[in-house]
């Protein structure tokens, strides 16, 4: 178990170093293009999260409204039935 953990520690330390050596071999234009690509992917992921949050919020509102409707239907004091019209 200790050996596995030590490999994980070594791998986690070497992982950023591999990016440094790769980044050093890239031109400024290539690095900029890679950063722009990452930014675009991040924006798309953020948009997906926003859309999912809107869906979740809509589902929650529907559940709350349907629960409120069910509660109103079971309410013993129904205003529509007991109210008298004003002459």
From Swiss-Prot:
Topology with respect to the bilayer: Multi-pass membrane protein
Domain of life: Bacteria
Gene Ontology terms for molecular function: porin activity
UniProt entry keywords in alphabetical sequence: Cell outer membrane, Ion transport, Membrane, Porin, Signal, Transmembrane, Transmembrane beta strand, Transport
One GO cellular component, as annotated: pore complex
GO biological process per UniProt: monoatomic ion transport
Compartments it resides in: Cell outer membrane
Signal peptide: 1-23
Disulfide bonds: none
Primary residence: membrane
TM ranges: none
Task of the protein: May be a sugar porin with a broad carbohydrate specificity.
Family the entry assigns: Belongs to the porin LamB (TC 1.B.3) family.
The protein's name: Putative outer membrane protein ArbH
